[in-house]
């Protein structure tokens, strides 16, 4: 690999590490992979507010589904 590619990869890793630290402080419960995917989506034109809304909605739906499965008789 050319040194420039290694530098870019290292810089990207550092950015994700910093974002993960911020994410942890804000209790977002997003891991590094999820943050990386969010960054990629935003870099490709996805509206950050819309992305945040989708993540919140998916978490709400997942929580409701989990509760429903725990409450249903087997």
Curated annotation (Swiss-Prot):
Its main location: cytoplasm. One of its GO terms (biological process) is gamma-tubulin complex localization. It is found in: Cytoplasm, Cytoskeleton, Microtubule organizing center, Spindle pole body. Coiled coil: none annotated. The keyword Cytoplasm applies. Pfam families: MOZART1 (PF12554). GO terms for cellular component: cytoplasm; gamma-tubulin complex; gamma-tubulin ring complex; interphase microtubule organizing center; mitotic spindle pole body; spindle. InterPro entries: MZT1. The keyword Oxidoreductase does not apply. Keywords: Cytoplasm, Cytoskeleton. Transmembrane segments: none annotated. Belongs to the MOZART1 family. Required for gamma-tubulin complex recruitment to the microtubule organizing center (MTOC). Part of the gamma-tubulin complex. This is Mitotic-spindle organizing protein 1. It comes from Emericella nidulans (strain FGSC A4 / ATCC 38163 / CBS 112.46 / NRRL 194 / M139) (Aspergillus nidulans).
